[in-house]
Amino acid sequence: TMQSHLDMVPQKNSSVKHDFLTDPIDAYIDGDWVKARETTLGADNGMAVAFAMAVLADKTLTHGPLEALFTINEEVGMDGAVGLKPGFLKGEILLNCDSEEEGE
Protein backbone atom coordinates (compact mmCIF):
# COMPACT_ATOMS: atom_id res chain seq x y z
CA THR A 1 0.00 0.00 0.00
CA MET A 2 1.36 3.41 -0.99
CA GLN A 3 0.11 6.05 1.44
CA SER A 4 0.14 9.83 1.09
CA HIS A 5 -2.03 12.77 2.05
CA LEU A 6 -4.05 15.10 -0.16
CA ASP A 7 -4.34 18.23 1.95
CA MET A 8 -2.03 21.18 2.33
CA VAL A 9 -1.44 23.60 5.18
CA PRO A 10 -1.86 27.07 3.65
CA GLN A 11 0.46 29.44 5.51
CA LYS A 12 1.87 32.82 4.57
CA ASN A 13 4.11 35.43 6.08
CA SER A 14 2.09 37.95 8.09
CA SER A 15 3.34 40.84 5.94
CA VAL A 16 1.82 39.37 2.75
CA LYS A 17 -1.71 39.64 1.38
CA HIS A 18 -2.40 36.27 -0.22
CA ASP A 19 -5.66 34.41 -0.83
CA PHE A 20 -4.88 30.72 -1.28
CA LEU A 21 -8.19 30.17 -3.10
CA THR A 22 -7.51 32.73 -5.83
CA ASP A 23 -3.86 33.85 -5.82
CA PRO A 24 -1.13 31.81 -7.53
CA ILE A 25 1.88 30.50 -5.64
CA ASP A 26 5.08 32.39 -6.49
CA ALA A 27 7.36 29.36 -6.99
CA TYR A 28 11.07 29.46 -7.81
CA ILE A 29 14.04 27.08 -8.12
CA ASP A 30 16.75 27.21 -5.45
CA GLY A 31 19.43 24.65 -6.33
CA ASP A 32 17.72 21.25 -6.22
CA TRP A 33 14.62 22.59 -4.45
CA VAL A 34 11.38 24.19 -5.61
CA LYS A 35 10.39 26.85 -3.08
CA ALA A 36 7.71 29.51 -2.71
CA ARG A 37 8.10 33.18 -1.85
CA GLU A 38 6.17 34.33 1.23
CA THR A 39 3.83 31.27 1.38
CA THR A 40 3.91 27.53 1.74
CA LEU A 41 4.51 25.82 -1.59
CA GLY A 42 1.48 23.55 -1.52
CA ALA A 43 3.43 20.55 -2.75
CA ASP A 44 3.86 18.99 0.66
CA ASN A 45 2.77 15.54 -0.44
CA GLY A 46 1.72 16.18 -4.03
CA MET A 47 4.78 14.31 -5.31
CA ALA A 48 3.76 11.20 -3.39
CA VAL A 49 0.21 11.39 -4.78
CA ALA A 50 1.64 11.72 -8.31
CA PHE A 51 4.04 8.83 -7.68
CA ALA A 52 1.27 6.50 -6.51
CA MET A 53 -1.02 7.45 -9.39
CA ALA A 54 1.81 6.93 -11.92
CA VAL A 55 2.67 3.49 -10.53
CA LEU A 56 -0.98 2.45 -10.55
CA ALA A 57 -1.46 3.71 -14.13
CA ASP A 58 1.73 2.24 -15.65
CA LYS A 59 0.84 -1.14 -17.13
CA THR A 60 4.49 -1.85 -18.07
CA LEU A 61 5.68 -2.23 -14.45
CA THR A 62 5.97 -5.71 -12.98
CA HIS A 63 4.68 -5.92 -9.42
CA GLY A 64 2.30 -7.74 -7.15
CA PRO A 65 -1.05 -6.39 -6.01
CA LEU A 66 -0.97 -2.66 -5.25
CA GLU A 67 -3.28 -0.27 -3.49
CA ALA A 68 -3.07 3.44 -2.74
CA LEU A 69 -4.32 5.23 0.34
CA PHE A 70 -4.85 8.99 0.23
CA THR A 71 -5.62 10.55 3.61
CA ILE A 72 -6.31 14.04 4.98
CA ASN A 73 -5.56 16.06 8.12
CA GLU A 74 -2.33 14.29 9.02
CA GLU A 75 -1.05 17.48 10.63
CA VAL A 76 -3.91 17.85 13.11
CA GLY A 77 -4.75 14.39 14.35
CA MET A 78 -4.52 11.91 11.49
CA ASP A 79 -8.29 12.21 10.92
CA GLY A 80 -8.21 10.46 7.55
CA ALA A 81 -6.14 7.51 8.77
CA VAL A 82 -8.05 7.17 12.05
CA GLY A 83 -11.29 6.79 10.06
CA LEU A 84 -10.11 3.61 8.32
CA LYS A 85 -11.97 0.46 9.26
CA PRO A 86 -9.85 -2.56 10.24
CA GLY A 87 -9.31 -4.82 7.24
CA PHE A 88 -9.97 -2.05 4.69
CA LEU A 89 -6.42 -2.34 3.37
CA LYS A 90 -5.25 -5.71 2.08
CA GLY A 91 -1.52 -5.07 1.78
CA GLU A 92 0.97 -6.41 4.30
CA ILE A 93 3.37 -3.48 3.82
CA LEU A 94 2.51 0.22 3.91
CA LEU A 95 4.92 2.68 2.31
CA ASN A 96 4.43 6.09 3.92
CA CYS A 97 5.44 8.55 1.22
CA ASP A 98 5.48 11.52 3.61
CA SER A 99 8.46 11.32 5.90
CA GLU A 100 11.51 13.43 6.53
CA GLU A 101 14.77 13.32 8.36
CA GLU A 102 15.05 15.26 11.59
CA GLY A 103 16.82 18.55 10.92
CA GLU A 104 16.04 18.50 7.18
Features from the language model and the residues they span:
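Active-site metal-coordination/substrate-binding segment of hydrolases
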Residues: 1-70, 74-77, 81-92
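C-terminal domain-closing interface element
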Residues: 89-104
